[in-house]
Amino acid sequence: MFLRRRRVRRLTVVATLFAALAAVAAGPAGAIPDRTPSARPPLVEPIDPQRWRNPDDMTWADYRAVPGTRWADPDVEPTQRTFKGALVLLDYPDEEFTVSQPAGSTLFGNPQPSASGIPRDRLPQFYEDFLNKPGTLNNGHTINEYWMEDSGGRIGVDLTAFGVYRMPSKSYQYGVEDSMNPGACPTGDTCGKDIRADAKAAWTADAGAEETGKFDFVFYLAAGQDESSTWQEFGQMKFADRQDVPAVWGPPVPIGSGSNAAATRYVPWTSWQAAARIWPNATDGSSLQTESSGMAVYAHELSHILGIGDNYNNPYGTPLSRAYTGIWGMLSRGTFNGPGGPHTRWQIPATAGGSMGAQHVLRDKLKLGIVDEKNVLRLDRDTLKDSGLAVARVTARSAPPGEKGLAGVNITLGSDLSPSCDRKTDPLCDGGGYDNYTVEVVDRMGMDSFTPDNGVLISKTKNKDQAPFAWVIDAHPEDIDMVDFQRPDGTTQKITMGDYRQLSDALFHAGADSGSQYEYTDKANRLHFYVLDLKRDRSGVLSYTIAIRSLDGSGPQRRGVDLDRGVVRGNPSKGRATCTFDLANTGRAGNAGARLGSDVYRLSASATGRGWSAWLPNQLATAKAGTSVDVGVAVTAKSGADRHGKVVLTARSESDPRKTAKATCALRTR
């Protein structure tokens, strides 16, 4: 037995119990509880516990820098292109910039004390610096930094500010639109005016057509609040019903209904003052924002300018749909990320919710051309059944994967074989028609610092921007049961099934008893996904080993598995001991490539003997053909347990379930 095992090349992996325990530190949101020296350690200690965080509870202390990078440094040049943007400031006859006013003086309670009383002639430089120069007010984070990190240093953003230009019409004449706010235009006024046309005319008259033509894109920055960040906070969160909205929150002159409330994009009513605001948007090389629009809004709108669409739902719609990529993607509600959560997005200056958006999901990075193909493993569903399963280590998307590392995996489907479902009746229906699966890793680091969790993100994606064009597979599809806000009458409002925060616990985690899932099977599309283990390197970069297997074939490789008897370490009668087994892949890979030469094994363990218990930290293991790995089983003995016990470990090949092995670990109390 020993001699035969020596012919098998050994491999050290994090699947061992001790390395896995060290990997618990991979979760920045939590750590192993403190113990007194006399405390008996628990048998169950998950290697990758899910401890998701509510964005409402986050602060700037949650930000973690990406090791070895300095994307916010203006001296770091992008490797491909710097996009030159004009930042054009606009105000109105009835509204000047909020940050020029005394702290807390506006109807909305802005500006915050951090920025107030700024003279009008200093506003262009103030906002140019706030958005794109690292400083105290923006906590050292910029739009340029976002795109440098998101693209791995490929593209950057440079801004030049102009203005302030006084618009010829009042603020609400631009903000009230028939599509979102029907019937909300004050009597005698004309609404739905084209602020871009008026802004471009004013800017061109000042700077000249030659100057305005030098830029790749234009950010129009208008004074005041935006509707997206105020409709809920200054609507149903503040007033019990539309009849309760007082005149101070109503129009300056009556609207046709005589109400102080007005319709808004997602719900039937909000206060008129909230509804009369501009909703940020992008078209034809320019985007429109306001003072309450955080840095993430600019990153979101620039994505549109670069040629990619929205991927979000109406969380209050009829029929109701689950969020698409939600909190995990810039083109979904990841735009809302930032300390304090979505209900702080009304604040000016915008340093809370909406100030640091999530990275783009892998599908969107591929479309934007901001991830290197050499760092993406391309697989095909039909090819997998002939090649056998693929095993790969994927680096967290916020960190550079290096020359040979992977930023993610894309599996081409050819066609989506999922059974049809009805989005009109089923909120969890993805609508079908997907072209791919993607697998990537999220860590709460860099621009993903204000996502709620670290783990593996699995998504179905489409090649065309036909929303939903990316759909996250939710490890917890059930209602997350999260409080949204307290209504004015004191009752609690939970988030809807369509709210993006339903996906806060969507990530997959490695190991047993994590609180999440470590595998996902799409029977219709004949694919099985595994999360095998995790590792955080010395610098702090997180990665996961994942595998994808076809349900229709295991490839030409000869499969095999063998186990050596276990070796116990520690005293099970005084606490938690470990039985370590040597698991060998005795198969042959043949001519399979580096990522196709492994197998995945499903493990089970049982203890015999009165008072003895066993627990597997990881019920999956992987090894390349011709190599072996250690598998740890945690064991403990209660007081009064039999003097002798036994743990039996069973390993079964996922590629060929006929290939199994068993081994025993002999135990005794001391």
Regions found by a protein language model. Name each.
Residues 640-669:
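Terminal connector regions
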Residues 288-289, 309-422:
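A domain-level signal for the mature, folded cores of soluble proteins
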Residues 93, 445, 585-589, 639, ...:
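Short, acidic/polar linear motifs in exposed loop/turn regions
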